[in-house]
Amino acid sequence: MNFVIIIAILLLGISLILAFTVLNKSKSKTTMAYKRAQEEKIDTEIKMLKNLKNNVCSGASDEIIDNILNSENNILKEALKNNLDDADVCKKLRR
């Protein structure tokens, strides 16, 4: 009887370890996909700002767009480093 209980406890422990590793692996894949999506979003916004910059002719506007390009790029990259959510990034962009 004790042998059956020991085997049941071992099987339960092994199943818990396997479940934890599967969930952890899924979490890391999701995190990587999220980071990749955020990086693509940053690249898209940078391209949009560069296109806007190329379409605007005045030097003053170029300087303003350069400032926007640099500030948004830095804020978004900082957000990726700190794993901030979109709401935090939006708050920083509004400041």
Swiss-Prot record:
Its main location: membrane. It is found in: Membrane. The chain crosses the membrane at residues 3-23. Keywords: Membrane, Transmembrane, Transmembrane helix. It comes from the Archaea. It is a single-pass membrane protein. One of its GO terms (cellular component) is membrane. This is Uncharacterized protein MJ0492. The lineage of its organism: Archaea, Methanobacteriati, Methanobacteriota, Methanomada group, Methanococci.
